[in-house]
Amino acid sequence: MIPSSTRELLNIADSKYAVVVAVAKRARTLSEKYKEDENYRLSTMVTRALDEVVNGKVIIEPSKEDGSREV
């Protein structure tokens, strides 16, 4: 389920940027995994990645001191 509000996403990470980066990284991983399958599109991967972040399957680590973050 995709949340209807960005407030829900801000409960997951400390910024919208962190959520976008995490979702993009996960979508890229998924698209590489399903690269051979023509039934999957990138938009499907982004939706799936967002769903995984919202449901806690992908954890967004807090920022490090140097400003980088782990997904």
Swiss-Prot record:
InterPro entries: DNA-dir_RNA_pol_omega, Pol_omega/Rpo6/RPB6, RPB6/omega-like_sf
One annotated GO biological process: DNA-templated transcription
Pfam hit, one: RNA_pol_Rpb6
GO molecular function: DNA binding; DNA-directed RNA polymerase activity
Keyword Nucleotidyltransferase applies: yes
Signal peptide: none
Keyword Transferase: yes
GO CC term (a single one): DNA-directed RNA polymerase complex
Reaction(s) catalysed (UniProt annotation): RNA(n) + a ribonucleoside 5'-triphosphate = RNA(n+1) + diphosphate
Residue intervals passing through the bilayer: none
EC code: 2.7.7.6
Key words of the record: DNA-directed RNA polymerase, Nucleotidyltransferase, Transcription, Transferase
Entry similarity comment: Belongs to the RNA polymerase subunit omega family.
Quaternary structure note: The RNAP catalytic core consists of 2 alpha, 1 beta, 1 beta' and 1 omega subunit. When a sigma factor is associated with the core the holoenzyme is formed, which can initiate transcription.
Record's function text: Promotes RNA polymerase assembly. Latches the N- and C-terminal regions of the beta' subunit thereby facilitating its interaction with the beta and alpha subunits.
Protein name: DNA-directed RNA polymerase subunit omega
Organism, as annotated: Syntrophomonas wolfei subsp. wolfei (strain DSM 2245B / Goettingen)
Name of encoding gene: rpoZ
